[in-house]
Amino acid sequence: MSDIRHVWIRLPILGCYVFLIGLMPVAQTTGQAEPGEHDGNVVTEWNAIAQNAIVTVGAQPIQRSQLWMTLVHVAIYDAVTSIDGQYEQFKVTPAHLRPASRDAAAIAAAHGILVSLLPSQQASLDAARENSLSAIRDGARKNNGIAIGEEVASRLLEIHDGVIPTVAYTPGLGPGVWQPTPPAFANALLPGFAQVTPFALASASQFRPGPPPALSSSMWTRDFDEVKSFGVATGSLRTPEQTEIGRFYTEHAVAQYSRAFRRYAIENGLDVQKTARFFAMANTAILDSQIACWDAKFHYNFWRPVTAIRAGDTDGNPATAPDAGWIGLAITPPHPEYPAAHGCWTSATARILELFNGTNVVHFALDSAVTGTTHVFETVDDLRAEIINARVYGGMHFRNSVEVGATIGEHVADWVAFGFRARRGQNEEEDRRRR
């Protein structure tokens, strides 16, 4: 697998931009299977149960799925860490019941969140709970663990109810303004997601970026021409490898990344405490990055490539030639373009991997149900670089928008990680720095 870097050269003779493509190895494509769920622990087990309930059976959109998945894993984390005592609770500190089973607490916490959010699935979720709890010996430890998990779930839902506000939104008109995109021309997706209270950030606008490039700028011309040439469905300048990258990340992101997180936890032998912390950090960083991204998207309301390229003669820039029939490789999601949500999402993931491990050198595998392939990344920089290219190859985004999204994701992850720190006094240097 390779990362494709584009170098732009102005050729006066041709009067157009030509791309010189250099190759930098970043990932391998393999056919390796995901480790079996029995190889993990109760956290990976209930992540898979949550994925099935929320995404597969519940058929929830990505943003609501991520909100609910974060509730599940913050509940698990607070329940487990209240027993272990090494880390501060993130949202809820339950009653001090001892002795207590971490596994029972995690199971009860996850179950409590899911049945509240998905009452129609109560029977199957209750059965999953009983099956998981059956592996734990009856007694005070089990009972106390269950009580802790149930308390955490109930109290967390009082803080974050998992509801996305309904907000009226009317698309604008004119150059640079988002409009519904083909083929479905669907209404904007969940504009109220920008008003969901973040789990860690002070506000959704905390890391709001500056505006997208002016339509008269050289950056706009560069990005317009790049996605027009590399992101088009047919007749593009993409290599087969680049086409695979463009399609790879078009799966439901919560399903795709949940599988990757389970694989990572299992392959690295993380115990229940470490798995709970990793899943809570990663999911919270992703969620808050998406809320921040939605805030910026619906603040700037920037148009998508498919709209911009079809109307290239309306932007006041003589260097952006229109193509009235242009359509991207992937279906454009129904929300404004700037910044790119997957840039925020994947960069937040990459930064959490780096902070969790204390190094940017990782072995992180993502598979795609769309392409049937697996990409293995040895550094977080490789993961971040590939998503920037992928959204351009898919025809959904301009390069600058993905880069800006990646910056947001990194900032959000740094902020989120502080909430999952060791108990006060174990990291006095960081405590002083943040005060």
Regions found by a protein language model. Give the residues of each.
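Acidic/polar surface patches and capping/hinge elements
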Residues: 30-431, 435
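Bacterial N-terminal signal peptides
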Residues: 12-25
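Bacterial N-terminal signal peptides that target proteins for export
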Residues: 3-15
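Coiled-coil-like amphipathic alpha-helices with heptad-repeat character
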Residues: 3-5, 23, 428-430
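Accessible peptide chain termini
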Residues: 1-2, 435
